From Swiss-Prot:
Its main location: cytoplasm. This is Homoserine kinase. Belongs to the GHMP kinase family. Homoserine kinase subfamily. GO terms for molecular function: ATP binding; homoserine kinase activity. The lineage of its organism: Bacteria, Pseudomonadati, Campylobacterota, Epsilonproteobacteria, Campylobacterales.
Length: 292
């Protein structure tokens, strides 16, 4: 079987650990029964020996497959990884969702996407990446009684994402370590208001208000200080008609939303100024993972 799992961009400014969306940029994995166990990795991580010795996809897959089927079969795994590692584009969530979906499919259990999503919560505590990876679209999600509750909205086809991918990784643990252990009431209320308003902007297609809705006081500036060029990326995007421009997940990638004509111009301007950074112009994915 073959599975495609999309990249995701989470937080979207004020929506810390609860908002995310899905991008048409996929990791592809082929999993087949085989006489012998084997792993082949192409693309991102292909030179990382650790990913072959202790592969999270493989570990999660076997854990669930053996639990569901009661068997210890050998499989051949072929990974075509396009999602950058440790760049805030949901590479870990793509692994988790992909492994679980494959395990259910190959053990003969037909599981819906909500089942896959709730299983994923055992491996990832926050739903902001796993929810759009499973469901597609723009997603607002929370956890309640060890279940994910998610509302999905398709993203307008007139919009595109400009993803700026620095040549520097940003480890999630390190990125969380710079955050304040306590927040003041004023900042908490600010983010509640802005996350709610941002969600309403997507639901009602009030995209012109996103530049106000996407402001944040809890995490973004603290993390961007780890790579100060990101402040310049954000300013350049907003000065050239971006609807919003925010840190993607915990970084180091940066997410910019714009109408298609503006998105092309923004991509070129960022690429011209930051030659060492990758800049991708991406459509939005409204399906989530796909089994082929």
């Amino acid at each position: 079987m073959k599975i495609l799992v999309p990249a995701t961009s989470a937080n979207l400014g004020p929506g810390f650990d609860c908002l995310g969306l899905s991008l048409k940029y996929f990791n592809q994995t082929i999993v087949e029964k085989s006489k012998f166990f084997s792993i082949s990795i192409h693309g991102e991580g292909e030179n990382n020996i650790y990913l072959k010795k202790n592969n999270s996809f493989v570990n999660i897959f076997y854990e669930i497959y053996q639990r569901l089927s009661g068997k210890k079969d050998n499989f051949r795994f072929v990974f075509q990884n396009n999602i950058p590692l440790a760049r805030g584009m949901g590479s870990s969530s793509a692994v988790i969702i992909g492994a679980i979906a494959c395990a259910y499919e190959l053990s003969g259990f037909k599981a819906d996407k909500n089942t896959i999503l709730n299983e994923a919560l055992k491996y990832e505590n926050h739903p902001d990446n796993i929810a759009p990876a499973a469901l597609g679209g723009f997603v607002c999600a929370l956890t309640h009684n060890e279940k994910v509750l998610a509302i999905k909205k398709e993203v307008d086809k007139d919009l595109q994402a400009v993803i700026t991918i620095p040549n520097v990784a940003m480890n999630t643990q390190k990125s969380r370590a710079v955050l304040a252990k306590k927040i003041n009431l004023e900042d908490g209320v600010f983010n509640l208001c802005h996350a709610s308003f941002l969600t309403a902007c997507f639901l009602e297609k009030k995209y012109d208000l996103l530049k106000y809705a996407s402001l944040d006081k809890l995490h973004q500036n603290q993390r961007m200080k780890l790579l100060p060029e990101l402040f310049e990326v954000q300013k350049l995007a907003l000065d050239n008609n971006a609807l919003m421009s925010t840190l993607s997940g915990s970084g180091s990638s940066f997410f910019t939303l714009a109408y298609k004509d503006d998105a092309k111009k923004i991509k070129e301007k960022i690429k011209n100024k930051f030659a060492k950074f990758r800049v991708e112009l991406l459509e939005f994915d409204d399906e989530g993972f796909k089994i082929c």
